[in-house]
Curated annotation (Swiss-Prot):
HAMAP family: PSII_PsbJ. Belongs to the PsbJ family. Keywords: Membrane, Photosynthesis, Photosystem II, Reaction center, Thylakoid, Transmembrane, Transmembrane helix. InterPro entries: PSII_PsbJ, PSII_PsbJ_sf. This is Photosystem II reaction center protein J. The keyword Transmembrane helix applies. Gene3D superfamilies: 6.10.250.2070. GO terms for cellular component: photosystem II reaction center; plasma membrane-derived thylakoid membrane. One of its GO terms (biological process) is photosynthesis. PSII is composed of 1 copy each of membrane proteins PsbA, PsbB, PsbC, PsbD, PsbE, PsbF, PsbH, PsbI, PsbJ, PsbK, PsbL, PsbM, PsbT, PsbX, PsbY, Psb30/Ycf12, peripheral proteins PsbO, CyanoQ (PsbQ), PsbU, PsbV and a large number of cofactors. It forms dimeric complexes. Its main location: membrane. It is found in: Cellular thylakoid membrane. One of the components of the core complex of photosystem II (PSII). PSII is a light-driven water:plastoquinone oxidoreductase that uses light energy to abstract electrons from H(2)O, generating O(2) and a proton gradient subsequently used for ATP formation. It consists of a core antenna complex that captures photons, and an electron transfer chain that converts photonic excitation into a charge separation. The gene is psbJ.
């Protein structure tokens, strides 16, 4: 990313002086160390795995009697 686009506080402004977007919409969703869609996908899979483990445990083991 270009350093000349950054403001005094280090953030990238939404618009350039001519009114055009400072960052294209394709790059806005993939900025940062990890893309947000990747974090959300891994988090969702973890939640589904834990819920599946609880359902599996309800049919087997101590609580199944």
């Amino acid at each position: 990313m270009s350093t000349k686009l950054k403001g005094p506080d280090g953030r990238i402004p939404d618009r350039l002086p001519d009114g055009s977007p400072a960052v294209s919409w394709e790059r806005r969703w993939t900025e940062g160390s990890l893309p947000l869609w990747l974090v959300a996908t891994v988090g969702g899979m973890a939640v589904l795995s834990v819920l599946g483990l609880f359902f599996f445990g309800s049919f087997t083991g101590v609580g199944s009697a």
